[in-house]
Amino acid sequence: MSDKTPRKPTAFRLEQPARVSAASEQEEPRHPRAVKDLEQITPQADVFDLTDDEAAELEILDPAFEAPERKGWSLSRILFGALGILVSFAIGIWTEDLIRALFARADWLGWTALGVAMVALAAFAAIILRELVALRRLASVQHLRKDAADAAERDDMAAARKAVDALRTIAAGIPETAKGRQLLDSLTDDIIDGRDLIRLAETEILRPLDREARTLVLNASKRVSIVTAISTRALVDIGYVIFESARLIRRLSQLYGGRPGTLGFIKLARRVIAHLAVTGTIAMGDSVIQQLVGHGLASRLSAKLGEGVVNGLMTARIGIAAMDVVRPFPFNAEKRPGIGDFIGELARLNSDRNARK
């Protein structure tokens, strides 16, 4: 035990902490005032978005369409024309000899062959007439493009009305343009400038068609990109690109009211190819596009998926060129689509496919 004397019990007063009410903790309400520093949400950067430099370089590879000058008779045209006449004579002589031989054998065989020949001739004449109408329709679209551009440049109201009336005629059978045509009819008398009338007609009538055309081009590019990514043979890739491009050209022409026949489609495809050849798109192939995109998008993808993006871009470029050729009015009020509008979607499509693997 300790030697210390135990202390006596004593009472202690404990100091109670001051109670603070919840109301006292709150600050006095502030007066209403305008908030200047609003909270801003910074969107997350997409790795597949193009930089300004990449978009500018892609636009350089995608110039606007300029109608080629009509050339006179070339040697190739004279050659094929002469061969066509000779083949027609040969078919006619062969048919005549066949009918004469059948008449010599039996009259009913001769009359049957003559009737079949007349039916074939009538069908051939109907096909030629249909093709000529389709060619005339395509030619009228090309003339309308030129007339609309001239009317907008000169601000000629009379020429603008004539061009808009021709556009109404072309779009009369297209249901997507019904609302735009109705609105244009109600506002035509209120517009006094030819340039404004051209821009209004382009906006109200061609905008829904342009939206559908972009969808067609994007879907075709996606299909080509997927087939290229999963295909193991280059011949399959080339064949599918040609097939998809031909179908895209025809569908775009039908969308804008062109409705080309066989000869019309061949002529339309030649114009698209000529446009691509002038801009150098076909010749650049893998070299320029891979140099352009290789340090950006394609470097983030595998080699095979990069080839899919390249082929998809080529298909998109063909679709854009086809839009330039078959569109009744040139792009003025509406923004012309470019390769940059499709490259992000193609890259995301291939990257998602690579991630699923």
UniProtKB/Swiss-Prot annotation:
Primary localisation category: membrane
Record key words, sorted: Cell inner membrane, Cell membrane, Membrane, Transmembrane, Transmembrane helix
- Give any Pfam family that matches: DUF697
Q: Where is the composition biased (Basic and acidic residues)?
A: 27-36
Please indicate which superkingdom the organism of origin belongs to: Bacteria
Span-the-membrane segments of this chain are: 78-98, 109-129
This entry carries the following GO cellular component terms, namely: plasma membrane
Q: Report residue spans for region: Disordered.
A: 1-36
Compartment list = Cell inner membrane
Membrane-related topology note: Multi-pass membrane protein
InterPro entries in the record, alphabetically?
DUF697, UPF0283
Give the similarity note: Belongs to the UPF0283 family.
- NCBIfam families (alphabetical): hyp_HI0043
Indicate what this protein is called per its UniProt record.
UPF0283 membrane protein BSUIS_A1077
Task: Please tell me the species this chain comes from.
Answer: Brucella suis (strain ATCC 23445 / NCTC 10510)
